[in-house]
Amino acid sequence: MKKIIIPVAAIVLIGVVGPKFTGNGINEGLDNFVSILDKSPGYIATIESRETSWFSSSAVINVGIDPLMFAESGLNPAEMVPFEDLSATINVTAQHGPFLTLNGLNLGLSAWKAEVDPSVFRELLAYAEDEKFYSVTGNVGLFGGVNFEDIMPKFTVIPQDGGDEAITFSGWNGKGTASSESATYSGAIDLVTVSAEGVTFEMQSMILEGSVEGDWTAPMRGDFYNSASQFAIASINVDMPMLDTSAKLEELIIDVKTQKSEDDNLMDMAINYAIGSIQAPQFSGRDLVVKTEVNNLEKGFFKAYQEASAKPAQMEQSIADMIETKLLPQLQASPEINITEMSGKVADGNFSGKVMAKVSAIDSLPESLEDPAFWVSKAVIDSNLKLDKAMILWVGEQVVANQIQADPNAAGMTDEEIKAIAGEQVEGMIEMFTQQGMITVNADGEYEMTFTMQDGQAMLNGNPMPLPF
């Protein structure tokens, strides 16, 4: 599957960046497009050939994955062979306006399309003979706005080396707009199924939506940007009959928003997760929510980290250089990691909580970055967790059960016996923690834990908590 998935990332990137080359003039835009793609972490892009006439232009672009990404993957030479040429040829055609017929009759500055060769992945995938594995078409209006659509056909994976896997993909349909002020995109997959070695996997209705303000190639250059996106899956089902095990997840939603500062030097990022329900062996949950924020990301540090991540072979040296030259400006910006909400229902219980952690008032780095006293003196933490009675009983039972299972003397006990013993012990454990002040009971009958730290002083439920340094 790696031989398929990794090159697909390169091909689909055409749909993400492709509209860029239509805005300024075909040839200039094409050069900019390839330059942006080639500088994107992990990608290689070159113009193999191009032709330009009065009414049209065409080019052949080669897009691939940089093999240096796998230089320190730990794979032996034989396993590295599939990664040596992870590339695809993209045929780009553009028609000059104002009268356009390339993608249907229209008026505009230009019309364009980009398609992979008809032979792409034929040895690995089965899809209709009259279709390309990936294509994107678009028009540039008279005022410079871009509309485009991209398509990936329905396909099945051809089993390799006598395997019995069966993988189907219902196809991808996406559409978007782009201008000098913003860009939008949305796409969907109806169904993905996988069956291999007695395990079946089914994913239904995956939707991706997103928007970016300003120059929408900024994320690819490592610049900061304002954006909003959502990734949603209606359901995921996994069935493993040989283990008499199955799991189901419904209504997964991931929202991501970014907001840059007015001077473009800082960016806040919010990532929110929501799950309608999940059913798995020994676990069930409903209305699960985790809302997170990463605030005050500093531009130089963020960009250096992206560049280091794209070069695994030089990662160690890149990280060392980044710490030496970029870490202090990031820390001076007072970075924050916040969980503004975590809540839901697990088994028959409810929980809710929040965590805020940041560093502040850092003017210089300590002689040793491993000095815990320095970080404690600069850290600010504010956290709270609430569990109702059913929830704390469930958590306590899991803790006690894990302790019993780790005891060699319990090796012959059944899960039912372990659960029964855990149920007998958990009430006493909770009472002990309450008496010790590790947890409190609030006016609503909820079990609560509050931990704060500032100026090197830690507090647990309002009481000073000694630190080991």
PLM regions with names:
Residues M1-I4:
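Positively charged n-region of N-terminal signal peptides that target proteins for export
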Residues I6, V16, K20-F469:
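Glycine-rich, small/hydroxylated-residue low-complexity segments
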